[in-house]
Amino acid sequence: GCMPEYCAGQCRGKVSQDYCLKNCRCIR
């Protein structure tokens, strides 16, 4: 599954974590 930590890790240093979390389909 897709987890917050995973999404944040994917975009770390690229864009804000908030952006990643909102763009993670598996997350609300």
Swiss-Prot record:
Expressed by the venom gland. Disulfide bonds join C2-C24, C7-C20, C11-C26. Keywords: Disulfide bond, Ion channel impairing toxin, Neurotoxin, Potassium channel impairing toxin, Secreted, Toxin. Blocks potassium channels Shaker-IR (with inactivation domain removed) and hKv1.2/KCNA2. It is found in: Secreted. It comes from Tityus trivittatus (Argentinean scorpion). One of its GO terms (cellular component) is extracellular region. Has the structural arrangement of two alpha-helices stabilized by disulfide bonds (CSalpha/alpha 3(S-S)). The keyword Secreted applies. One of its GO terms (molecular function) is potassium channel regulator activity. Belongs to the short scorpion toxin superfamily. Potassium channel inhibitor family. Alpha-KTx 20 subfamily. It comes from the Eukaryota. This is Kappa-buthitoxin-Tt2b.
